[in-house]
From Swiss-Prot:
It comes from Pyricularia oryzae (strain 70-15 / ATCC MYA-4617 / FGSC 8958). It is a single-pass type I membrane protein. This is Pheromone-processing carboxypeptidase KEX1. The gene is KEX1. The keyword Glycoprotein applies. Residues 25-512 are lumenal. The chain crosses the membrane at residues 513-533.
Length: 634
């Protein structure tokens, strides 16, 4: 009995050590991107990428791609970027909008001169689970906004555990389109978390930026028609207009009968009908319609913008390359390649029990500044709808952009490097920026202008680091200097000191991860040695008393002369694990390689990412034309 208890305690200790080793395998070093296929010559932007588990019971993991800032201006900042959909990958933002690189073709990256990582760490997250490189069991897609926000906070908790050097940064959450629902909900959950007395480390949420956001559905649904009239897409006296106005009345009635919703089916059909009835057969014999993301452009019906932007033809094949997937630490058992927008996620995420995010904005504005920006040529989440809900909303003691009763904050004309860029308007913690001649994806059209906007909103001060400031003016008045396009200097002692602190924190995190694994390995080795010693001693004792031989139910371990159970254990998996062809248990590795340990979990081979949405794409990875409602979404 005592022998059995000793064996049980021994294997329990070994199992505990193995379990700890598995959990410790995810360290900052595991996420480090050592090289990126197609990257331009010169130093690679420091980056990390991979999955973080947010719902173990549903096998839900969020994928992130993090880029370290180029320069530190007066304080550390982190910008988190989310695309919309719902179900559209934030790698759109990484490779077509605000990330450090753009694709010249499907295998060549070039620098993005307007990248948002100039003065801020920049992280893209495929959100919610099932989107892009993120994954979850196919029957467990997120359906409500609070559930999404809960998972995102879990993601941030684990991210900051892995990278504690970023946990006290000023945090900004940015994105576009349907992220106008995600971002306010995430912000609310962060603010609630910070108010919890049990929270040890508060996160410094400093601002939200939402571009062409789907925030106030009621105003946006009505704006489909108002925007079309203003742009000459629709004749107010036409039969088409009468049909659409009747549809909108049905939409308004459903809204009134059922209360505010994020998504109303009868209202969604207004845009689809508008695109269909305004389409025409043109000289090439094909039916063409307006591009709903940029009304200056045309597209074949029923795509109506889903073939845009042009960079998309390079992004999809690039993110499906085996070497790129490996470089970004995407799970190799992924059942499908990267998809820009996962239809199954969008179909599940109806948020029928969630209030539209506009209901959250007034309370958030009491604590956090918000910047809303719009591209003037976007139809699907157009600026008329955004301006309408701002005008109706009451926050911080006033309605709309009132500065005094009856007096509104002026729209200040914005010029960028001598060109008309749009206007700015702000009051009581809310800023609104209209980008002239821009589409649904503002940073795609104007990356440098968009970063100028970001830097001003964050209060970037380049006086300590130098650099060439851009000429950006409001009503002719030159604004505080920020650099756009030119590299900032890095010459002051203050800058070097801040960088040194950051590096020290980072390497401390890496060392800590390595030390934990070494301790676990040492404990396991001692426990195993003790067990072997006790087993040999006991076996010798049995032979001396009985003259017998070891039991047939056990096997001899070659080279040790000891016995182990013939039933495989967790230790067996650890013992056979090899790194670069070398035996990990034998110690044939250096300390830095501990960061590269990865253990396959039981779930590795059984998850699927949007497997039921693969029918949206053809063999080349391009989206099939399934009508306006079956494509990118918002």
């Amino acid at each position: 009995m005592k022998l059995a208890m000793r064996r049980a305690s021994t294997f329990a200790l070994l199992a505990l050590s193995w379990s700890a080793a598995v959990s410790a395998a995810s360290s900052a070093g595991d996420y480090f991107v050592r090289s990126l296929p197609g990257a331009p010559p010169g130093p690679l932007v420091k980056m990390h990428a991979g999955h973080i588990e947010v719902s173990p019971e549903k096998n839900g993991n969020l994928f992130f791609w993090h880029f370290q800032n180029k320069h530190i201006a007066n304080r550390q900042r982190t910008v988190i970027w989310l695309n919309g959909g719902p179900g559209c990958s934030s790698e759109d933002g990484a490779l077509m909008e605000v990330g450090p690189y753009r694709l010249k073709d499907d295998h060549t990256l070039v620098p993005n001169e307007g990248s948002w990582h100039e003065f801020a760490n920049l992280m893209f997250v495929d959100n919610p689970v099932g989107t892009g490189f993120s994954y979850v069991n196919t029957d467990s897609y997120v359906t409500e906004l609070d559930e999404m926000a809960d998972q995102f906070v879990i993601f941030l908790e684990k991210f900051f555990e892995l990278f504690p050097e970023y946990s006290q940064d000023d945090i900004y959450i940015a994105g576009e389109s349907f992220a106008g629902q995600h971002i306010p909900y995430i912000a609310k959950h962060i603010l609630d978390r910070n108010k919890n007395s049990m929270t040890k480390i508060k996160w410094n949420l400093k601002g939200l930026l939402i571009g062409n956001g789907w925030i106030a559905p009621n105003e946006q649904y009505r704006a489909y028609l108002d925007f079309s009239y203003s742009k000459g897409l629709l004749d107010k006296n036409s039969e088409t207009a009468k049909t659409l106005e009747a549809q909108h009345k049905d939409c308004a009635k459903e809204w009134e009968d059922n209360g505010p919703k994020v998504d109303v089916a009868k209202c969604e059909s207004v845009l689809q009908t508008l695109l269909k009835l305004s389409s025409k057969v043109e000289a090439d014999g094909k039916r063409h319609c307006v591009n709903m993301y940029d009304v200056r452009l045309r597209d074949t019906y029923p795509s109506c913008g889903m073939n845009w932007p042009p960079d998309l033809v390079n992004v999809t094949p690039y993110l499906r390359r085996k070497d790129v997937v490996e470089a970004l630490h995407v799970n190799p058992n992924k059942a499908t390649g990267w998809t820009e927008c996962t239809g199954a996620v969008g179909q599940s995420f109806k948020a029928q029990k969630s209030k539209p995010s506009i209901d959250l904005l007034p309370k958030i504005l009491e604590e956090v500044p918000i910047l809303l920006f719009s591209g003037a040529e976007d139809l699907i989440c157009n600026h008329i709808g955004t301006e309408a809900f701002i005008g109706k909303m009451t926050w911080n003691g006033g309605k709309g952009f009132e500065v005094t009763p009856g007096t509104w904050a002026p729209r200040r004309d914005w010029t960028f490097e001598g060109k008309d860029a749009g206007f700015w308007q702000e009051a009581r913690n809310l800023t609104y920026v209209l980008f002239k001649d821009s589409s649904h994806m503002v940073p795609f059209d104007f990356p440098r202008r968009s970063r100028d906007m970001l830097d001003r909103f964050m209060g970037v001060d380049i006086s300590s680091i130098g650099g060439n400031p851009t000429d950006s003016r409001l009503d002719g008045e030159k604004l505080p200097e920020t650099t756009v396009g030119g590299a900032a200097g890095n010459s002051t002692s203050k800058q070097e000191e801040e960088k040194k602190k950051l590096d020290e924190a980072k390497w401390y995190a890496y060392r800590k991860s390595g030390e934990v694994v070494l301790v676990i390995v040492a404990v396991a080795a001692v426990a195993w040695g003790w067990y072997v010693w006790r087993d040999r001693r006991r076996r010798r004792g049995y032979q001396g008393i009985f003259g017998g031989s070891p039991s047939e139910s056990t096997t001899r371990l070659p080279g040790l002369g000891s016995r182990i159970s013939s039933t495989p254990s967790g230790l067996e998996g650890f013992r056979s694990k090899r790194q670069n062809g070398r035996d990990v248990e034998a110690g044939d590795f250096d300390e830095s390689e501990l960061d590269d340990l990865h253990t396959q979990t039981p779930t590795d081979a059984r998850y699927s990412v949007g497997a039921d949405s693969d029918d949206e794409e053809d063999a080349s990875g391009s989206r099939k034309e399934g009508g306006p409602s079956g494509g990118r979404g918002r």
